[in-house]
Amino acid sequence: MHFHERFDVIVIGGGHAGTEAALAAARMGSKTLLLTHNIDTLGQMSCNPAIGGIGKGHLVKEIDALGGAMAIATDYAGIQFRTLNSSKGPAVRATRAQADRALYRAKIQEILQNQPNLRLFQQAVDDLIVENGRVTGVVTQMGLAFEAPAVVLTAGTFLSGKIHIGMQNYSGGRAGDPPSIALADRLRELPIRIGRLKTGTPPRIDANTINFDLMTEQKGDTPLPVMSFIGDVSQHPKQISCFVTHTNEKTHDIIRGGLDRSPMYSGVIEGVGPRYCPSIEDKIHRFADKSSHQIFIEPEGLNTNEIYPNGISTSLPFDVQLNLVRSIKGMENAEIIRPGYAIEYDYFDPRDLKNSLETKSIDGLFFAGQINGTTGYEEAGAQGLLAGMNASLQVQGKEIWCPRRDEAYLGVLVDDLSTLGTKEPYRMFTSRAEYRLLLREDNADLRLTEKGREIGLVDDERWAKFSEKRESIELELQRLRSQWVHPNSPLIDVLNPELNTPISREASFEDLLRRPEMDYPKLMSLEGFGPGLDDPRAAEQVQIQVKYSGYIQRQQDEIDKAIRHETTGLPLDLDYQEVPGLSNEVIAKLNDHKPETIGQASRISGMTPAAISILLVHLKRRGLLRKKAS
């Protein structure tokens, strides 16, 4: 049975990847269908009730700069906002928000329901329709076929998902939701490498049974940060505190005593878990010398008594979970509302994807999110936006686009995955980006919004606000460069008391701002130097561009050198056995990874500069030396 309409793009799954994919394709004018097993769970925060953080916040800002929904929903749902690494340089500062689950889900659903060109339909997908190496549609659980030339698959943890609590396990996509078994079996027939990964979640605690007086209160920042570039503090709901407590030796003894019934340590779980978000069992085992571990007590919302104890993700049996929770200071009488669990699921080797996130083996089929081996809402949302955008571009007959590593954390994410692959759940850190001074949270819009507008992702309202901000920054920078103060100027009397070294020769306002003891608000407060910019985000941008101009230019010079052969394309059907001079080891690595560009090839572990030179010579001799479209 065929549905009565055809679509341009079909998105399977309504999590963070799926919602951003569907919204991106629809914003670009493609007739888009979002299929989900349950419309009520669209935008669900399945694990921790938070958005952002180190590296992750950068991705949220980039999603926002390209017109995505995650940051907007966070501003409407955030019940505590903090800037992490605020005492460090701007490259590693990151915004993190504690979110009310219900408010976040409601805002995402509101955005989806009001998006032109987007249709929602509640049905699980069991099969893909593939004809002559190209996807042409999908078939749902009830046998209904939907047709489209592009399909974006964002299955999350649902593919052959198996939930573990102690030695008990059962099939599930997450607690309370069925897994996707038929679709997982169908995908296993495709010529794409497959593996198993694992993630977990902590038990949820009843706030009424916690003694918060025995814990350390953690308040949000003042002034309140805002997540979206078009957001405003007035959108934030009521702000509340989180709390901090710690495990202790008694906790650790309880956990050690239960390891014989742990599915992780008894060999029941095959999948590899996230290195940077380990279970409490893993922490006790790997860091045996530590006498305590920090736990963040995070409210799940304004109108719920559920608490998320960030730091004790576990799949231990329920009785062990209850005992370990009650051994922690402030939770001696705690009651568990939902037990913690681990979940195993299928993922596919992202080296079998192009950097557009289209599979190399099936034309028109795109993967995004945890199916590619990543972990985290932010990583999923970023991939979803890219996959939905490129699916739409392909359908419209336009060139696909993926930012380079020097243009966005999204570019770093996709390049890492498609070039190196991953054997464990991948999460983003600022340390993964070699050009992180240029890839700051604060300039994500300046880096990406113009490109987003060109592609069709950015609407008129966002574009107008961005253009106004960009123009005000440029005009203010011009003013600071063009206005000067002399040693005999009347302005000296108000200026010198604020400087470590008095002015001895003429200096521009820009020179003054570059001094370590001076910042933009202080300079603008001095008589004769202001009034400056009213928009604090534009003012921050002016200060950063001035103070870090030397470092920024140096990094840009490095990029210009590195980019010379970065985008030189490598034909996917290139027979590396025919390239004279390559070692058998290098040939094996190239055949295994199938890089799309010289840049990707150069980042494969064990690839030598000599091998890259040999490849370039071969391409030149064969007349294949050309840049890959970006």
Swiss-Prot record:
Function comment: NAD-binding protein involved in the addition of a carboxymethylaminomethyl (cmnm) group at the wobble position (U34) of certain tRNAs, forming tRNA-cmnm(5)s(2)U34.
Pfam assignment, any one: SAM_GIDA_C
GO molecular function, one term: flavin adenine dinucleotide binding
Chain sites annotated for binding NAD(+): 273-287
Cofactor list: FAD
Lineage of source species: Bacteria, Pseudomonadati, Pseudomonadota, Gammaproteobacteria, Alteromonadales
Family from the record: Belongs to the MnmG family.
Quaternary structure (record): Homodimer. Heterotetramer of two MnmE and two MnmG subunits.
Stated name of the protein: tRNA uridine 5-carboxymethylaminomethyl modification enzyme MnmG
Keyword tRNA processing attached: yes
One CC-aspect GO term: cytosol
Location, primary (coarse class): cytoplasm
Subcellular location: Cytoplasm
PROSITE patterns: GIDA_1, GIDA_2
Species whose genome carries this gene: Shewanella woodyi (strain ATCC 51908 / MS32)
Binding positions for FAD per the UniProt entry: G13, G14, G15, H16, A17, G18, V125, S180, Q370
GO process terms (BP): tRNA methylation; tRNA wobble uridine modification
Keywords: Cytoplasm, FAD, Flavoprotein, NAD, tRNA processing
